[in-house]
């Protein structure tokens, strides 16, 4: 029997902590920092944005993570038409180091160097994978509808032994226009990985810049999808980084919840486009 993603609806709502916003730029790296108003030895993540996005397109998501006790540093770099993917990966690593090495707020907020992870959406999801390979500081990675990047995150995943969560299209998804293959990324992942597929989710619906999307004809934001993915992120990160056993099911490969399926085995292989043709061999 598959495990249940317990309290997903609760985790999809704002958490109990008041949230503070800070300027990452004071460290020399443009961007934003979001933290709970207080707390010691907190888990923390660096967050990478998608192509042509900036931190403002994810403000509600970043505040949501902080409201559940997870500090977030989000670089506002590589936002142009021709971004340097390796450069964004390097900035994510720097942001993670800043979280673990700088006392935040008025000195009453600290992030444990042993509770750091990397999260990203689209291009940022691919960059998160690149940043985590051979990086002992990264304890977990979450890639939300990861896009293709250069160097290839799909290939880099073969050498990624950090636990990971990949959020991507499910069997009901139309990934024709998605600029990546999240399922193949998960298939190649060398370490423990879970693949979550929110119902009718796609890469274009997660960021919050709805007006920009309408102008450019790139679809629209999906508030329900955003809330579901936020809940998945909170549960997974609290278990992996903070070792909160109440959310252990979020690290189970076959766990499912309302509106969320998990792809494993043959289903994941098929979604990755690697399913074998089992037709009988014939000379004619």
Question: For the regions a protein language model found, what residue spans apply to each?
Answer:
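N-terminal cap/lid segment of alpha/beta-hydrolase-fold proteins
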Residues: 1-40
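Short beta-strand element of the alpha/beta-hydrolase
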Residues: 41-50
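Short amphipathic alpha-helix adjacent to the substrate-entry channel of hydrolases
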Residues: 56-76
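Alpha/beta-hydrolase active-site loop
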Residues: 57, 83-114, 126, 130-133, ...
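Active-site loop/turn elements of alpha/beta-hydrolase fold enzymes
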Residues: 70, 77-79, 146, 200
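Conserved alpha/beta-hydrolase "nucleophile elbow" surrounding the catalytic nucleophile
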Residues: 120-125, 144
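The feature captures the conserved acid-bearing segment of alpha/beta-hydrolase catalytic domains
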Residues: 139-203
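Alpha/beta-hydrolase-fold serine-hydrolase catalytic core, especially in secreted/extracellular enzymes
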Residues: 200, 209-284
């Amino acid at each position: 029997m598959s495990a249940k993603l317990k309290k997903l609806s609760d985790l999809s709502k704002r958490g109990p902590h008041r949230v503070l916003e800070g300027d990452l730029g004071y460290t020399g790296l443009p961007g934003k920092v979001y933290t709970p108003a207080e707390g010691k030895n907190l888990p923390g993540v660096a967050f990478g944005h998608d192509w042509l996005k900036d931190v403002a397109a994810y403000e509600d998501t970043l505040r949501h993570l902080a409201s559940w006790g997870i500090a977030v540093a989000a670089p506002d770099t590589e936002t142009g038409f021709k971004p340097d993917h390796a450069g964004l990966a390097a900035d994510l690593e720097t942001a993670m180091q800043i979280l673990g090495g700088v006392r935040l707020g008025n000195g009453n907020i600290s992030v444990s160097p042993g509770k750091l992870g990397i999260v990203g959406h689209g291009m940022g999801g691919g960059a998160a994978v690149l940043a985590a390979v051979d990086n002992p500081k990264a304890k977990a990675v979450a890639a939300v509808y990861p896009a293709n990047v250069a160097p290839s995150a799909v290939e880099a995943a073969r050498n990624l032994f950090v636990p990971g969560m990949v959020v991507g299209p499910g069997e009901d998804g139309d990934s024709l226009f998605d600029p990546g293959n999240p399922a193949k990324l998960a298939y190649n992942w060398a370490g423990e990985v879970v693949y979550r597929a929110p119902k009718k989710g796609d890469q274009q619906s997660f960021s919050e810049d709805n007006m920009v999307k309408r102008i450019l004809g790139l679809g629209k934001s999906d508030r329900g999808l955003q809330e579901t993915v936020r809940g998945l992120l909170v549960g997974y990160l609290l278990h992996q980084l903070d070792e909160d056993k109440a959310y252990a099911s979020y690290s189970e490969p076959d766990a499912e919840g309302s509106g969320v399926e998990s792809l494993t085995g043959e289903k994941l292989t098929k979604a990755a486009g690697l399913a074998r043709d089992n037709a009988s061999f014939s000379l004619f």
